[in-house]
Amino acid sequence: MAASDLESKAKEAFVDDDFELAAELYTQAIDAGPATADLYADRAQAHIKLGNYTEAVADANKAIGLDPTMHKAYYRKGAACIKLEEYQTAKAALELGSSYAPGDSRFTRLLKECDECIAEESSQAPAKNVEAPVAATVEDKEDVANMDNTPPVVEPPSKPKYRHDYYNSATEVVLTIYAKGVPADSVVIDFGDQMLSVSIEVPGEEPYHFQPRLFSKIIPEKCKYQVLSTKVEIRLAKAEQVTWTTLDYSGRPKAIPQKISTPAETAPRPSYPSSKSKKDWDKLEAEVKKEEKEEKLEGDAALNKFFRDIYKDADEDMRRAMDKSFRESNGTVLSTNWKDVGSKTVEASPPDGMELKKWEI
């Protein structure tokens, strides 16, 4: 098979969230030759999705070697280096890449993240020496008389700070918490209808708790997680096929639809325990539903609810048609006729007066 055909199939696999297949097809395309900068840069992105950050950096470097002005190669090198906590290397790559793509907000966002991580590392280093000047004050004879009445200076226990990020697929949100070397039995994760509770309690360390109200509803019984050597990966099964623009409900736009009917709403569920205390998830979800009931949908929200209701009552072919047409057209076409769209690629059709632009990642 020609390299161009393999590259096309690799792109299709990536769009379908089959990142392992995408990486393998890019490898076959590179072996078939010629090995282009685009192939290495795109395989780097597949490696990032798979968590193979060292391989991603290697591929990005090969792409840069073939095309020193390819901004997406620098971007992917920077993104992978951040995951490896190589912040200075990431910053250098992102700064150079942004010079070839001025105005690209993605570089601005990652550079800001880099600066924050570098500042955090810098602030942690001198903190260990804070006790030295405090101890030296004992030598001051004028203060010796007051030492008996001075409470001892106690250094606060170190609190683990785990970074996290997430990405969307059509059916789930994958949340990654970067907690290295955490024993599996120290991790307790509970799922609610629109709630997530993560507790990590390592002996001798301050407990870590992360309990957001989620951007949208999930299906608790389909959610799962895995504790790995460098991270905790949590897969949240979406109850409705919308793109999460943030992880937490507090950051979601007002226009995003809220209400959705699922079998899980009518079936009684037990309260989900956490590692510290028992939480009544049903009570929390009742409060969420009360807020949703009081919300008045209008504009885009009302339209989204209309389409969601169609999807809810549709048969399997109608749902397949809606999913395929919406995904392949970048959200510009929604068809319920599987016979019409099942055997062809649905072309994008932006509204009158608007121009379709591809966003390169």
UniProtKB/Swiss-Prot annotation:
Key words of the record: Cytoplasm, Nucleus, Phosphoprotein, Plant defense, Repeat, TPR repeat
GO CC field: cytoplasm; nucleus
Protein name: Protein SGT1 homolog
Post-translational modifications reported in the UniProt record: Constitutively phosphorylated at Thr-262 and phosphorylated at Thr-150 upon infection with the fungal pathogen Ustilago maydis.
Region of interest (Disordered), residue spans: 255-295
Regions of compositional bias (Basic and acidic residues) in chain numbering: 277-295
Annotated source species: Zea mays (Maize)
Molecular function, one GO term: protein-folding chaperone binding
InterPro entries, sorted: CS_dom, HSP20-like_chaperone, SGS_dom, Sgt1-like, TPR-like_helical_dom_sf, TPR_rpt
Localization of this protein: Cytoplasm; Nucleus
Residue stretches spanning the membrane: none
Entry function: May act as positive regulator of basal defense. May be involved in basal disease resistance to the fungal pathogen Ustilago maydis.
GO biological process, one term: defense response
Family label: Belongs to the SGT1 family.
Lineage: Eukaryota, Viridiplantae, Streptophyta, Embryophyta, Tracheophyta
SUPFAM superfamilies, alphabetized: HSP20-like chaperones (SSF49764), TPR-like (SSF48452)
Effect of residue 150 to A: Does not affect nuclear localization
